[in-house]
């Protein structure tokens, strides 16, 4: 049996309102639990449209057929009008999720984090994280114990900024296996659970067709030599590609794969995890930099 951590990112108002309820129903039908990470502040995701001037982002949008994949309400959110507050508008849905699944913070403002966190000060990072955690805790009525940086925009500064929140783990980067981030000689931070597998929008296109994606990603899960972690998005697998995701759950079960919340991947003694660090890097299919796992001894 292959255990795969299932991470569900919720970036937008529509993803929360429409995608999450469908995902909850789908997961319930198949007896699967996952980790949901919510954006709880304003939905300004439409402001990413300026990135269309960047060839790699434009190609990604064309390759994934973004207009039909996400919908124009998502692609234009927060452009001509102020972004609506996601948490306030969908508190009941978020509370229901937290009743049945591990629930953590994705971002206060997903667009702001993805666009500006790379040059924010530690204090600005801490204030933004605190704002998101405070809002999410007010909604679910219990402490937030985990987080996942929006767009995997994380580096050593983000690791340090999250230390004061006493989280059980963070999932801020791409990598191969769980690790303890090295803060300074002799001091380590909150365990990191990297995402190890590609997302739908990173690979779909000429090389991998939609109808063959599930076969392809299951093969990658079975071949993963580290700790497999797979990310889906409420805006994609919860809406237009919900039937495809349900088919994935069936095929994965038949292949001997068991999905679980990320927290279940943590060992009883996190001190046994190897040391590492998060550095800025790039991966195929995703525009811009993102946090990548690196061995602590690397320069």
From Swiss-Prot:
EC identifiers of the protein: 3.5.1.n3
* This protein's GO CC annotations: membrane
What pathway annotation does it carry?
Glycolipid biosynthesis; 4-amino-4-deoxy-alpha-L-arabinose undecaprenyl phosphate biosynthesis; 4-amino-4-deoxy-alpha-L-arabinose undecaprenyl phosphate from UDP-4-deoxy-4-formamido-beta-L-arabinose and undecaprenyl phosphate: step 2/2; Bacterial outer membrane biogenesis; lipopolysaccharide biosynthesis
A GO molecular-function annotation: hydrolase activity, acting on carbon-nitrogen (but not peptide) bonds, in linear amides
Q: Which reaction does it catalyse?
A: 4-deoxy-4-formamido-alpha-L-arabinopyranosyl di-trans,octa-cis-undecaprenyl phosphate + H2O = 4-amino-4-deoxy-alpha-L-arabinopyranosyl di-trans,octa-cis-undecaprenyl phosphate + formate
NodB homology domain location: 2-260
Q: Does the keyword DNA damage apply?
A: no
Q: What Pfam families does UniProt report for this protein, alphabetically?
A: Polysacc_deac_1
What PROSITE patterns is this protein classified in?
NODB
Q: Kindly indicate whether the keyword Hydrolase belongs to this entry.
A: yes
Kindly state a single biological-process term from the GO annotations of this entry: response to antibiotic
Query: Which keywords fit this entry according to its UniProt record?
Result: Antibiotic resistance, Hydrolase, Lipid A biosynthesis, Lipid biosynthesis, Lipid metabolism, Lipopolysaccharide biosynthesis
Judging by the UniProt lineage, the source's domain of life is: Bacteria
Q: What class of enzyme is it?
A: hydrolase
Supply the induction statement. Induced by BasR.
State the function annotated in the UniProt record.
Answer: Catalyzes the deformylation of 4-deoxy-4-formamido-L-arabinose-phosphoundecaprenol to 4-amino-4-deoxy-L-arabinose-phosphoundecaprenol. The modified arabinose is attached to lipid A and is required for resistance to polymyxin and cationic antimicrobial peptides.
User: Per the similarity annotation, which family is this?
Assistant: Belongs to the polysaccharide deacetylase family. ArnD deformylase subfamily.
Q: What is this protein called?
A: Probable 4-deoxy-4-formamido-L-arabinose-phosphoundecaprenol deformylase ArnD
Q: What is this protein's gene name? A: arnD
